Each structure stands twice: as C-alpha cells, then as structure tokens.
C-alpha cells in the first residue's frame, strides 16, 4: 500500500496535472463532482491497482484522501464507470508529458486482457490449433533522460511494430530516435529524417541495405546513442511490475483508456521519484577537500 507522505504528493501532483481538462464538460452538469476530482480518482485507482469498488472503499475509510480531493461525499462506483466511458482517448493523451526531448526511444509490449496467465490461457484453448494470442499491444515513445511516456498507440491483437512507429512520433520533437531492429525500414528512417528533422538510430537487419542520402553518403549509426534504447524496456518493466500486466476492462475502448490512465499514473509516479532525488542531492552538504591544493 502507498505510504501517507507519498500519497499526499501523488494526489497533489495529480490535481495539478488534470487542470488541463475542463472542470465541467457542460454548463448543465449537476456540479456534485467535477472532472478534476473524478480524473484524480481514476489515476489514483491505477496507482493502487484497485477495482472501481475497491477505490471507493479506500476513499470511504481514508479521510486524508477525501480531504485532498475536496470530496464532500464519496461517489458511487457507477459514477466513475460512467465518467470513464464518456472520456475520449484524445482527452487523456493531453495529460501525457511534454512533446520535446533530446533522445526518444520507441518500443512495444503486450498486456493481457484478462487475469489468466499465458500458459493457462493456452491450456484453456488447447483444442484450438493456434495459440491464445488475444492481448493489447502498446507502443510508447519515451524521453530517455526522464523516462517519461510522451506518446502512445494501442492496438488489439498482434501487429507488426512498424505500423505504429510514425503515429507515436508525429507530434514529437527530438534530436535522435532510437528503436530496435523491429523498426528497421527505409520508410521509418525517411520519416524521422524528413518529417521530424532528426536522426534515426535503428540497427540494420542482415537483409537490409544501408540507407543513403541523395548525395550517396551513408547514414551513420551511433552505438553509444542507441544504447539509450534499453530505458524504454525499463519503463515497460516498471509499469507491469507496479501497476500490473493485465487490463480489467471488457471492451476495447475501455481497455485503451484504462491503459492510458496507467501511463499517466506512471508519469506522475516518475515525476515524484525524480523530485525526491533532486531534493536529496541538493540537501547534501557541499564539502571541498583541500588535500591536493598547494598554497
């Protein structure tokens, strides 16, 4: 369970973030709960890995959380479900981080759409000739410096990695884009060079020719920059370990929004961790050693 001091910082950061969304979607709203309160609860739900009923019970027995969310009374779990269904993924995307970085890393990973493990699901569908492969495929672009998630694209079932490469990068700005061999294609490199005005650091497959500019010069590959790509795998590992590798929602639209809420919760969490590191570093005394100085 999240500790009380960290809960305070998490809720405060969440309340500041959700102000990007209008407080009410309509002037005819009943004004009992505003959008900022409901968004904060849904983000907190992902941080605590709770169901709708569980997060409501948590708020009922946690006066600190209610006070920080300015809740005069706790909403019903159906209120959160209806609000979640009304939200659009585009509105949630605006809650992700800034769109500019030095190095951006792109990768994809799968999330289960039920509680069954991969092995158990295959046993359950053992009569089928093909393996059980129904899952959500999440493609993300991260800032390798802060490890914030900057953009995302979610699809149902297996898809090739290169399909979503331009989509997650189209609104971003950077100096370098790093990705693994799964994104090796002339089309992707041309997109990064011409559309983003950046340099692609994508290793070539054995069957791929070297990309050449119009003048005949080869596109250089910098291994030192490419090694930053491992950080996107770290981000996926943290998300699945802290928030779960399965999705509770039933419909595809709800599953997408639940996963975006999970990314938002991760970004808030990451921001708090980085701020604590900076505070700890700045609070250390600045000692100067005169051992090797001669006067």
Residue ranges of each PLM-predicted region?
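Major-groove recognition helix of helix-turn-helix-like DNA-binding domains
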Residues: 67-87
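DNA-recognition alpha helix
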Residues: 53-69
């Amino acid at each position: 369970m999240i500790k009380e001091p960290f809960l305070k910082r998490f809720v405060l950061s969440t309340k500041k973030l959700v102000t990007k969304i209008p407080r009410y979607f309509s002037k005819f709203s009943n004004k009992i709960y505003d959008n900022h309160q409901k968004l904060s609860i849904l983000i907190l739900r992902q941080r605590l890995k709770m169901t709708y009923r569980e997060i409501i019970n948590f708020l009922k027995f946690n006066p600190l959380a209610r006070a920080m969310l300015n809740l005069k009374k706790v909403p019903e779990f159906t209120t959160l479900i209806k609000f979640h269904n009304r939200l659009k993924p585009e509105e949630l995307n605006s809650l992700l981080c800034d769109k500019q970085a030095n190095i951006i890393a792109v990768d994809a990973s799968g999330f289960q759409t039920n509680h069954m493990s991969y092995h158990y699901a295959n046993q359950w569908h053992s009569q089928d000739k093909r393996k059980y492969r129904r899952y959500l495929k999440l493609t993300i672009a991260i800032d390798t410096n802060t490890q914030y998630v900057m953009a995302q694209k979610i699809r149902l079932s297996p898809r090739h990695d290169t399909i979503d490469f331009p989509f997650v990068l189209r609104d971003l700005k950077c100096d370098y884009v790093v990705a693994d061999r799964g994104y090796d294609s002339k089309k992707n490199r041309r997109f990064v060079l011409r559309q983003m005005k950046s340099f692609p650091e994508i290793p070539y497959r054995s069957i791929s020719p070297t990309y050449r500019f119009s003048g005949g010069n080869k596109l250089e590959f910098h291994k030192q920059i490419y090694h930053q790509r491992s950080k996107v795998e770290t981000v996926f590992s943290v998300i699945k370990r802290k928030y779960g590798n399965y999705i509770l929602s039933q419909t595809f639209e709800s599953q997408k929004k639940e996963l975006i809420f999970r990314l938002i919760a991760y970004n808030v969490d990451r921001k708090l961790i980085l701020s604590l590191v900076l505070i700890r570093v700045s609070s250390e005394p600045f000692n100067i050693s005169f051992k090797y100085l001669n006067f």
